[in-house]
A protein has these predicted regions:
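Right-hand nucleic-acid polymerase module
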Residues: 1-153, 163-293
């Protein structure tokens, strides 16, 4: 089997969003390329199914990509956008893979506003330790959770957590301010899309340089891994999808008949005329009453 080179940060390379409102753009962007194919990576998280289609190379990663990786540091805004895209995908996958209807969607505030993000993180981690001590006494494993510390007028904590303890038990272990716990559920035939979007919405914050805005429990969450197929879609099929975006949903539903198409985004790079396609689909067979195993 011929070796294929597709191990690179394609989201960094294909960073311009494609707008097909005019045909002139495609004429400027598309360039014929030899030695190029497309890898299809799929990621299943709960009832969500992501499809990522990106260029692979039959000989080696082109010099232009290596130079792009080695060139001077990206602008702060470009790097922030890339980091945000990676973070959103990881959070999306963790939540959909590890949480179920009946789990908890929580908001906690601080009566005494922490002086900085680092202090807030320490207080939150102490809260998780208190939760786990109660669970241990009950013979339960450590809590599963994904959280984000957010600043609007004041710092506060948003949290998705499993329902091993009652809402009253969880609230009693916060003790630092107001608490509001809702039962996690689906909304309008989606899974937890709204929760993910809310947690990762754009907002001014006081993140320290290099710090994540969100975190999760350690050692008990499953992060779905991509499954690669290097022959699923030919270059011709990919270009047809780019040129006929209205047909992408129908085409993907033929390729993956157990899923309904939901949304797509196409990005490109203007120096090599190649494309990256991201699509989200949702299982047709997902049972709303499905509970934690």
């Amino acid at each position: 089997m011929k070796r294929v080179f597709d191990d690179y940060d394609y989201e960094r390379i294909y960073d311009k969003q494609l707008d097909l409102s005019t045909g002139e753009l495609l004429e400027e962007v598309v360039r014929p390329q030899r030695g190029v194919a497309y890898t299809t990576a799929t990621i299943k998280s709960g009832n969500q199914f992501e499809v990522e289609i990106y260029p692979s190379f039959r000989h080696q990663i082109p010099d232009m990509i290596r130079r792009h990786k080695e060139k001077k540091r990206e602008s702060r805004e470009c790097q922030k956008n890339l980091n945000d895209r990676h973070a959103k995908k990881k959070l999306f996958r963790l939540i959909h893979e590890n949480f179920y209807p009946g789990d908890y969607w929580c908001t906690f505030t601080f009566a005494d506003d922490p002086k900085d993000l680092e202090t807030a993180e320490k207080l939150c981690k102490n809260f998780f330790r208190r939760i786990n001590r109660v669970r241990k006494k009950k013979g339960l494993e450590n809590a599963k959770y994904v959280y984000i510390i957010e600043e609007s007028e004041r710092l506060h904590l948003h949290l998705v957590m499993d329902n091993g303890l009652s809402k009253q038990e969880v609230e009693s272990k916060w003790g630092l301010g107001f608490s509001h716990i809702q039962t996690l559920n689906y909304y309008k035939d989606e899974n937890f899309i709204g929760i993910c979007e809310y947690m990762m919405k754009e907002k001014k914050d006081i993140r320290l340089k290099g710090k994540k805005r969100w975190g999760s429990s350690k050692g008990n969450l499953v992060l779905p891994k991509p499954s690669k197929n290097r022959t699923k879609l030919s270059k011709k099929k990919v270009m047809d999808m780019v040129l006929n975006q209205d047909s992408i949903g129908e085409r993907l539903e033929r390729e993956y008949p157990n899923y309904n198409f939901k949304e797509v985004e196409i990005r490109y790079n203007d120096w090599n005329g190649l494309f990256y396609i991201y699509a989200r689909m949702q299982s047709k067979k997902w049972n709303r009453a499905f509970k934690r195993p």
